[in-house]
């Protein structure tokens, strides 16, 4: 994996609040190597470690994208939903930003069936077929389509398991990380001071509660993905 410069600087991370962890009573001892201090009852993340692992993650996704690999971004916090969707669309990644359904990856055959139903319903609606149905039947199908759009809209073009999964909140997306571990899918995860850094292939110590922190980390990753995709397209 080639190392590159991703313009990751401490001042920018401090301004985004990346260094603020949880209260000292809520910490996970496994995060000790990534904590630099305690301040007013709160753990402070070592931003030098954050920069190192974020840079490694950017190198990884750049190399993967330059080879045409696929990515799935998972972040189902309500406040982060729009951020996840816009970042994923910008970098042409799949995403889940509403709810992670258990078995979404490990029961991929079922997920594929749901996606097929979703695509069929979208096609029928676009062709105006709902207009020829009784009102009650049309209303039922529209509700079903709306539900599928809400929960599967971010993966509607996903035809196979992703090559790399990016997780924005380890504790909230624990099931997603478990499924990736079972399937051997490499993962990149933000880890706050109450998380377990051993659960992902690359853990980026960072504040996973503040939108400015999440946005900064995610923007760096999707920029690297976009750069890798551009190289892949040029070399085809």
Swiss-Prot record:
Annotated Gene3D superfamilies: Glucose-6-phosphate isomerase like protein, domain 1, Helix hairpin bin
CDD domains: RPS2
Subcellular location: Plastid, Chloroplast
Listed GO CC annotations: chloroplast; mitochondrial small ribosomal subunit
Molecular functions per Gene Ontology: structural constituent of ribosome
Family matches, as Pfam families: Ribosomal_S2
Keywords, alphabetical: Chloroplast, Plastid, Ribonucleoprotein, Ribosomal protein
Main localization (coarse): plastid
Family, as annotated: Belongs to the universal ribosomal protein uS2 family.
PANTHER family: 30S RIBOSOMAL PROTEIN S2 PROKARYOTIC AND ORGANELLAR (PTHR12534), SMALL RIBOSOMAL SUBUNIT PROTEIN US2M (PTHR12534:SF0)
Protein name: Small ribosomal subunit protein uS2c
Species, as recorded: Zea mays
Gene: rps2
